[in-house]
């Protein structure tokens, strides 16, 4: 018989940087999950993606065991990395802070495709372009 699911926890954690400090510790502690075990498994799985923010969905079962699924980094983080910026514009409709090419947008769309609800790469690219626009990043091409 399958284990009973008691909850889901959604977090965004730096790759290879999970530790028991907030926000990870309190979120897992509330559900009774072994915090150190999660940190070890997450850090081992995401070591190759150092420096990126990785969204993770943790499924907690009634016997306090857990499984987790990592997602692709948020489009905003990938756009900032491609445009070599620290942060987006505070006023994206007035101040443009950087530019990315259509080729870079397509590359991000290819990476994000499994997590986006789009049929093709063009649809995914449109979503990434919308994110860029809301951050004050101009898409050229």
Swiss-Prot record:
Upper lineage: Bacteria, Pseudomonadati, Chlorobiota, Chlorobiia, Chlorobiales
Molecular function (Gene Ontology), one example: structural constituent of ribosome
Post-translational modification: One or more lysine residues are methylated.
Keywords carried by this UniProt record: Methylation, Ribonucleoprotein, Ribosomal protein, RNA-binding, rRNA-binding
A Gene Ontology biological process term: translation
Protein known as: Large ribosomal subunit protein uL11
Quaternary organization: Part of the ribosomal stalk of the 50S ribosomal subunit. Interacts with L10 and the large rRNA to form the base of the stalk. L10 forms an elongated spine to which L12 dimers bind in a sequential fashion forming a multimeric L10(L12)X complex.
Protein role: Forms part of the ribosomal stalk which helps the ribosome interact with GTP-bound translation factors.
Database matches in InterPro entries: Ribosomal_uL11, Ribosomal_uL11_bac-typ, Ribosomal_uL11_C, Ribosomal_uL11_C_sf, Ribosomal_uL11_N, Ribosomal_uL11_N_sf
Gene3D superfamilies xref list: Ribosomal protein L11, C-terminal domain, Ribosomal protein L11/L12, N-terminal domain
Similarity annotation: Belongs to the universal ribosomal protein uL11 family.
Pfam families: Ribosomal_L11 (PF00298), Ribosomal_L11_N (PF03946)
Species in which this protein is naturally found: Chlorobaculum parvum (strain DSM 263 / NCIMB 8327) (Chlorobium vibrioforme subsp. thiosulfatophilum)
Cited SUPFAM superfamilies: Ribosomal L11/L12e N-terminal domain, Ribosomal protein L11, C-terminal domain
């Amino acid at each position: 018989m399958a284990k009973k699911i008691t909850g889901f926890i959604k977090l965004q954690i730096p790759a290879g940087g999970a530790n028991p400090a907030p926000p990870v510790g309190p979120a897992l502690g509330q559900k009774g999950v072994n915090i150190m075990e999660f940190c070890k498994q997450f850090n081992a799985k995401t070591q190759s993606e150092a420096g990126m923010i990785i969204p993770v969905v943790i499924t907690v079962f009634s016997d306090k065991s857990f499984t987790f699924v990592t997602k692709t980094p948020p489009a905003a983080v990938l756009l900032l990395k491609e445009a070599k910026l620290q942060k987006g514009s505070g006023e994206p409709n007035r101040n443009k802070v950087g530019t990315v090419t259509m080729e870079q947008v397509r590359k991000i769309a290819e990476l994000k495709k499994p997590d986006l609800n789009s049929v093709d790469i063009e649809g995914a690219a449109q979503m990434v372009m919308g994110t860029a626009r809301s951050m004050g990043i101009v898409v050229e091409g």
